[in-house]
Amino acid sequence: MTQVQGIEMRAAVATFAKVVCAACFLASSFAYAQLFTFPKQDLIDYTAKSSFDRLPDGRPKVPDSMIERARGMSAEEVWATLEEKGYNNQYADGFQILHPGKTMVGRAFTVQFMPRRDDVDDVAEAKAKERGLPHLGNQFAIDMLQPGDVLVVDLFGKKVDGTIVGDNLFYYVMKATHGGGLVVDGSVRDLDGLSEIDMPAYFRAADPTPIGNVMLTGINVPVRIGGVTVMPGDLVFGDLEGVYFVPPQFVKEMLDRADEIHVHDEWTKKKFDEGKYKSSEIYGSPKDPALQKEYREYLKKRLDEIHKKEGQQ
């Protein structure tokens, strides 16, 4: 590509994202047109409220220690912080859940598909050929996954031909992310095989057809999952109810608040175990000044212990 061609191409791209590569093929009869993605600096700009370090692709890197802390949280604790901040569109439900007893936590790696359109596909195929891109299709995105990622895929609710993975690729995702997880507004296949792989997944349906008649249009861009706008690098939290997508700038506060709630619950139950108090004397906060002082001291001691332990991990 000449310098002039490069300038013309960049000028044609929307300010929200830039084209960095085009179509990838599978060995079957269909192709994927792609791809819009954030250049690293744009991704940093759109997630500038996060103070965390950055992954090589520019996503906020919620620390591994915080990901582990989040596994002990409840959905109510996640929601409380989001609601307080006014982020009321961060929850998606209505999924089928693989391994429903296993909490899913990780950093969002987002992928977007759209229904295939031939004239768009033709241009994308030509650009892919110019750039010498491999014929990988959905695997192009999957091969970019890193440890700690959760693969978050907008497949516009597609069931037939909307299967982002079968058991082989699901196993690869598990290995690449170290068991992070999968959220897809679409379907999966080989459900019997998936059930034998120890990684949580949230999906709309299972279907025997391979993925097809779609275009891969975005990697690490904002995607829609249900009524949620998911940003690359969001903390993904999945439980028995559904999936929460937490902006990184709220993660530390959310975890600190959860620690305080856990300690409060711990102290409350200890006092109940003593058999000396009525519930109204202890829950939700102690009424007696001496008990209030005891609780404050207990809270400080336990939080110091928790944070010291986390610092050693």
Where are the regions that the model predicts?
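Feature captures the catalytic cores and cofactor-binding loops of soluble hydro-lyases/lyases
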Residues: 73-77, 82-232, 245-277, 281-313
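Bacterial N-terminal signal peptides
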Residues: 16-29
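Buried hydrophobic positions in well-ordered alpha/beta secondary-structure cores of metabolic enzymes
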Residues: 58, 173, 234-236
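N-terminal pre-domain segments of enzymes
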Residues: 34-79, 85
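N-terminal secretory signal peptides that target proteins for export/translocation
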Residues: 1-15
